C-alpha cells in the first residue's frame, strides 16, 4: 500500500509518516513493554493532531455491544456502518480481545460512496493491567485512484 496522506498530522520530532505507526509508538511508550496502558494514560495531547483520527472503544460482553466513547473529528462522520472507517475499526475488534495483542489492519473500503485504501490500528487498554476494558483505535485513508487496480476489499492484518 502506498503512503496515505498525513494532512495536519503532528510529527512532534518523530520521523514516522504513518499515523498508525505514530499512535502505536505512543501506545508502546506508555505500555513500556510491561502491560496494557490504562485509558487515563492515553492523553490526546501526547498524540497531537493524530487524535482527530482516533477512537476509543468501550469493550462490552458480548463484544457486539461494544461502543465508542471517543471519536476524533475526522472519524465522527463515519459513525458507524461497516463501510466507514469507524465501522471498520469496530468490525476488527473481536479477534483483538482474545489475542490480547495490537493489530494493524489495512485494506480497501468505501467511505461516503468513494472507494478508499485505509490503514488502522487497534491497541488494547486496561485499567487493572489484566482485563482489556477499552481499545484505542486510529485510522486514516486515501481515495483509490480511478486507474488504480482494486484489491477487492482484501484486508491485511499484522499482529504486534
Per-region residue spans from a language model:
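Intrinsically disordered, low-complexity terminal regulatory regions
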Residues: 1-79, 87-160
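Short basic alpha-helical hairpin corresponding to helix-turn-helix/winged-helix-like nucleic-acid-binding
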Residues: 83
